Amino acid sequence: MSGMEATVTIPIWQNKPHGAARSVVRRIGTNLPLKPCARASFETLPNISDLCLRDVPPVPTLADIAWIAADEEETYARVRSDTRPLRHTWKPSPLIVMQRNASVPNLRGSEERLLALKKPALPALSRTTELQDELSHLRSQIAKIVAADAASASLTPDFLSPGSSNVSSPLPCFGSSFHSTTSFVISDITEETEVEVPELPSVPLLCSASPECCKPEHKAACSSSEEDDCVSLSKASSFADMMGILKDFHRMKQSQDLNRSLLKEEDPAVLISEVLRRKFALKEEDISRKGN
């Protein structure tokens, strides 16, 4: 009996009878049962053969949560022990299909929704393409201005004098240059509107209108100067178009500068700073006079 009593384990709070009321820890130990909690158990899915299990357990684990959340266009979830064939040929078996937990969010779907919201809308893309087209058109017009320097020499007063023989051909073309200014219009929504320009009268019509051009001695001179006149007049018309655009830009800039100057004059901070500057300037002048 003495050997059996020596092997019995006695808790420390029961070793001394008078020690149970001596500390709070011993009082808690006497009231609470110090037994381990029961372990959580999972039920295996029914009617699953050993061939389907392979090397992985049929019980779902924490690793399946990310797998379930990554599923797309699926209202069900499966354990990792199942094989995943092609999407268009796979049909779930009713024995191994589990109901998907609604509390697990589909993170990939929300990310795709955010990316779709960040994409620019179609009107913005069309507006950008329109702006790019307008910039390219302006660049071509500026290039024509640079090329029109050579045409400015041909449009001298000597060229337009009454005694010159080329007066009959260029005069109708200047009327067309007035109409060609409407071929490029910058509106508030930065769109380009092309207006049909009446075609220039042909050279034979001009020659038929003037009897001097129909003479045989003037035919060679008219044929040689036709190409030069057409090139110079086309350059002059493009130059007139671009000059009108530049004038509009200059007027807009002047109106903006005028509005800014008016706002600057009406700004109270500007008025206060101007008064303080004058006041300190007068004080400095008085101090300099007294020092002298």
From Swiss-Prot:
InterPro entries: Mtfr1. The modification Phosphoserine is found at residues 41, 103, 110, 224-225, 238, 261, 273. Changing residue 103 to D: Leads to fragmentation of mitochondrial network. One of its GO terms (cellular component) is mitochondrial outer membrane. Pfam families: Mito_fiss_reg. GO terms for biological process: aerobic respiration; mitochondrial fission. It is found in: Mitochondrion outer membrane. Phosphorylated by AMPK. Upon stress, phosphorylation at Ser-103 and Ser-238 by AMPK is sufficient to induce mitochondrial fragmentation. The modification Phosphothreonine is found at residue 30. Belongs to the MTFR1 family. PANTHER family: MITOCHONDRIAL FISSION REGULATOR 1-LIKE (PTHR14215:SF3), PROTEIN OF UNKNOWN FUNCTION DUF729 (PTHR14215). Mitochondrial protein required for adaptation of miochondrial dynamics to metabolic changes. Regulates mitochondrial morphology at steady state and mediates AMPK-dependent stress-induced mitochondrial fragmentation via the control of OPA1 levels. This is Mitochondrial fission regulator 1-like. The gene is MTFR1L.
